[in-house]
């Protein structure tokens, strides 16, 4: 058994809604009541959010904040369109600035291109070079902060530029920035990795952040995944970051449709969050 907690447990705002807009105090009330250590704020509209208001909510309810975003439609780090490419880099730089203003030190997301964009071909060499060059420029901004920046590989149905841990490590090696790492999402990994636990061990200290859910996007622990062995792997890695429950509010039809949820995967979003947290904590503490 572990002697002291190294892992913190968070909940993603997709549990409630698609876009966090800054005034949803009920999110903080729920997360605190459910027993989470923190909240992962997800939005494309961070330019319109008051950082001081966000900080005040976190302080009022005693929960820490992490931040998640992705490139909006029309942007891309793999494009040959110079204006689009520059605008995409600028978007990520603004996200970094927003995190600084909020006192957030963990920024994560699927950044190479918008979620769901597929080119119809595997990642081309010129696109890979373009992506690496973009992250090198982002790293120039990143190293002036205390922020950890985690890039998420997506499954093949939602992205084509980064699908596996191996591809992610190749990107990190090319960029060579200690503040750049990987967000590893169990849903995507259960599709793309032949051995999820081996992939985590391969990522090792390059794993900066984790999204957890069952294989069907449901409650952690309600599936056949080897959760106990997985937590042992995290201990082997000496992982000390966040394990954040990410699933999607089925009642938010735009969000559910985007995640291809055609049926409920838990009795309720509250049950998914609470039962998932209870299971994760208990499994972590007994391994």
Swiss-Prot record:
Pfam families attached here?
A: AP_endonuc_2
Q: Spell out the catalytic residues.
A: 152 (proton donor/acceptor), 246 (proton donor/acceptor)
Please give the superkingdom of this protein's source: Bacteria
Q: Where does substrate bind?
A: 188, 217
UniProt-annotated binding residues for Mn(2+): 152, 185, 211, 246
Q: Which cofactor does it need?
A: Mn(2+)
User: Which residues fall in a coiled-coil region?
Assistant: none
Alphabetic keyword roster:
Carbohydrate metabolism, Isomerase, Manganese, Metal-binding
Question: Record keywords: Protease included?
Answer: no
Q: Name one GO molecular function term.
A: isomerase activity
Q: How is the cofactor bound?
A: Binds 1 Mn(2+) ion per subunit.
Presence of the UniProt keyword DNA-binding in the record: no
Q: What is its EC number?
A: 5.1.3.-
Q: What class of enzyme is it?
A: isomerase
Which family would the database say this protein is a member of? Belongs to the hyi family.
Q: Give the protein's biological function.
A: Probably catalyzes the epimerization of ketopentoses and/or ketohexoses at the C3 position.
Descriptive protein name: Probable ketose 3-epimerase
Record organism = Synechocystis sp. (strain ATCC 27184 / PCC 6803 / Kazusa)
């Amino acid at each position: 058994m572990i002697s002291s907690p190294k892992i913190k447990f968070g909940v993603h705002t997709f549990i409630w809604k698609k876009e966090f807009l800054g005034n949803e105090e009920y999110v903080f009330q729920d997360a605190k009541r459910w027993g989470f250590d923190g909240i992962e704020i997800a939005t494309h509209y961070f330019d319109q959010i008051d950082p001081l208001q966000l900080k005040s909510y976190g302080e009022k309810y005693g929960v820490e904040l992490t931040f998640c975003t992705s490139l909006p439609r029309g942007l891309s780090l793999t494009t040959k369109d110079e204006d689009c490419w520059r605008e995409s880099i600028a978007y990520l730089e603004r996200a970094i600035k927003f995190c600084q203003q909020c006192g957030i030190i963990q920024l994560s997301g699927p950044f190479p291109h918008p979620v769901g964009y597929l080119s119809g071909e595997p990642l081309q060499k010129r696109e890979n070079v373009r992506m690496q060059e973009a992250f090198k420029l982002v790293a120039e901004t990143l190293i002036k902060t205390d922020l950890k920046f985690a890039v998420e590989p997506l499954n093949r149905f939602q992205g084509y530029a980064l699908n596996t841990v191996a591809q992610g490590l190749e990107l990190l090696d090319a960029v060579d920035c200690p503040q750049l790492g990987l967000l590893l999402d169990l849903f995507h990994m259960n599709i793309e990795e032949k051995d999820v636990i081996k992939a985590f061990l391969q990522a090792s200290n390059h794993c900066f952040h984790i999204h957890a859910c069952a294989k069907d996007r449901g409650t952690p622990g309600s599936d056949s995944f080897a959760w106990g062995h997985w937590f042992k792997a995290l201990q082997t890695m000496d992982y000390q970051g966040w394990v954040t429950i990410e699933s999607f509010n089925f009642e938010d039809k735009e969000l559910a449709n985007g995640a291809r949820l055609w049926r409920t995967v838990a009795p309720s979003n509250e049950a998914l969050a609470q039962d998932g947290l209870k299971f994760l904590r208990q499994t972590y503490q007994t391994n």
